[in-house]
Amino acid sequence: MDELRDIRTTGPEDVLNSVDPYRYTSQIPNGKSNNGLNAKMNGNNTLTNMINRSIAKNMGQNASSGSMRRSMRQSLRNSLPRSSIGPQQQQQMNSTQNSTYHNTARDPRPLRDKNFQNLLQQEIFSYLTDQKFDVETNHPISLKSLKQPTQKDFIYMFKWLYLRLDPGYVFTKSLEHEVYSILRTIHYPYLATINKSQISAVGGSNWPKFVGMLHWLVIINKKLDECLEHLDVSINNQVTQDITVLNQPLKTAEEQEKKQEKYELMVERLFIDYITESYKSFLRLEDDYEPYLHDLELSFQRFVHIIETDIAQLTSTTEHLSVECESIVAKNYELKNIKEKNTGLEQEYKRLSHGVQITQAKSKEWPDKLKEIEDEIDKKKRDIRQVSLQIDELTSVLKRKNISGEEIEHKNKESDSISKSLDTVSSRLDQFTGLVRQQRLETESVYKNLQDTLKQYKSATEGLVIARKNLGDHIDESSIELVLPSDLMSEEMIGLTVEELIGDKKSFTDPIKKNLNKIAEDIKMRITNIQTENSKLQIKLEDLRNEITTKNEDLDQLEQQLSSIKSEYEEYRQESQSQLLSQNIKIEKLERKIQNARVESQQKISSIEREAEETRLKLEELKLLQNRERLELHNKVIQLIEYVSNFKINTQSSIEELQNATQKELQRLQTEV
């Protein structure tokens, strides 16, 4: 986990520089291996490292979640170099493991219990089914395969479970040695209950032990899957932190450009991850690219969510800024009004200041003016005194002439009345003069309007005559012509009526009106005929429109058919290209498989020939040994026959001697009795 933390805190270039290239091989040490297979594996590992370095250079400091996930999985699964364990260390490890196995040789699980076996088998079957064991291995699996297994079923299950723990491992030895060495390397706690002879025949009474071993591998795989899932979650959290950084508000155009560059880098990462995973799958001769495409779609959905969030944030920011802009505009308008008022007040202040200055300047002149006014008042007082003296003198003169003041006042009143009547007459004369002038102006305006009307009438009649002439109807222009006298505004023409003005020969009611009515009726008839023709043309126009509509519909249908045919052709072309590409890929894979099979067959043929030669030599040695042993057996048989014959002869002689002794003893006893 410390290694994972270091990987998360450093950039992809530092990680790739610090990674041991041997970690991308198997962590299980091999004593002997095929040189050709090792060279092939080293070539694949070199290619993988080159791809990883290329991805790291393109990604910069922010490595994508997919590549980090893959590198971390490889770091977890391939944490030990293949060549890191030497023979002495292997022997020490084996001795340590053997001591451990001897200490924990007893398996506490009730593997002989049928119910417990069913539980283990069901759990193993569920895990294999969930992880698509049958799809990956192309080997069917069922509960019957776990209850009554074959050697092939066990091999497929064991290889698949172990390769999930160590994807870089290559099975090269025989199954008995391979399984036993793998279990010893991964510290299977109950290895002492299994021996190599049992591995060569897993069925029968030994099967519960192997069910327990497979269940232990399933548990280890589940724990590893949980750890990797937790690691994926932590990496996704790191991606979420990048998303949070992208969702921060922007303040400058430079930040917007940086965010745009991050968006482009994210899209490049997504495609690079997809292409890299697909290429690795292609190198593994796998045709299923759907998981990588699904990951690409999910990544693009997250990317679209980021874009939508950014757009929503920019929209809200724009709305907020628009509200602020409106408030600023309103404040600016108020500020403008305030500035205008301030300008007006400043002008008023300047005007008042100027007035005050003028007043202050004039206030300096007031004492002189007051002095002049006082002098003027004194002068007027003196004049009044002189006038009063003159009045007194005139009064004394009138008394001497016997003229009273009442007569003077009466004469003044008469003079006033005469002046008033004169003023009244002059005012009435002015009124009459204004009325005459006004009437003359009105008459002139009426005369001008009449002349304008006559001009309009004349232009209208001329247009009517020309129009009727174009239609073939000749009208006498003099019959509808009106002419006014030239001296209409003279004083002799004042007070004439309309009939007197125009004359007895011409009247509005008789010939002109009749002619105009006749022309109007003719025009109405022509309008009616034109309307009927227009209605017919309208019907034809509607028919043409309907026909155009039907033609347009037919044209749209043909265009739709053309577009559908084009789309079908394009789909067929793309499908053909994809099929051709897939066929080429299959051909390349088959050629690669054929070449690999050819190489393997050559290797197998050479190994079989070598084994046949060794077997022939062994057969000859065995024949010689058989002949030698046959001679030895013949000698032994002859010796045994001789021994048996001698033993028989000796036995018979002993029996005869015993019989003779017995008879003698019997005779002796008989004689004594």
UniProtKB/Swiss-Prot annotation:
Where are its TM segments located?
A: none
What's the stated role of this polypeptide?
Acts as a component of the essential kinetochore-associated NDC80 complex, which is required for chromosome segregation and spindle checkpoint activity.
What's this protein's family per the entry? Belongs to the NDC80/HEC1 family.
Q: Give me the ranges of the annotated region Disordered.
A: 1-39, 60-111
- Compartmental location: Nucleus; Chromosome, Centromere, Kinetochore
Keywords, sorted A to Z: Cell cycle, Cell division, Centromere, Chromosome, Coiled coil, Kinetochore, Mitosis, Nucleus
Per its record, how is this protein called by name? Probable kinetochore protein NDC80
Q: How does it assemble?
A: Component of the NDC80 complex, which consists of NDC80, NUF2, SPC24 and SPC25.
The record ties this protein, via Pfam families, to: DUF5595, Ndc80_HEC
Q: Does the keyword Aminoacyl-tRNA synthetase apply?
A: no
The Polar residues compositionally biased stretches are 24-33
Taxonomy of origin reads:
Eukaryota, Fungi, Dikarya, Ascomycota, Saccharomycotina
**rRNA processing recorded as keyword:** no
What gene is behind this protein? Answer: NDC80
Q: Which GO terms describe its molecular function?
A: microtubule binding
GO CC terms: Ndc80 complex; nucleus
| GO annotation terms (biological process) | cell division; mitotic sister chromatid biorientation
Gene3D superfamilies the UniProt entry points to: Ncd80 complex, Ncd80 subunit
Coiled coil, from the record: 328-402, 436-464, 513-673
Residue spans of biased composition, Low complexity class: 64-80, 88-100
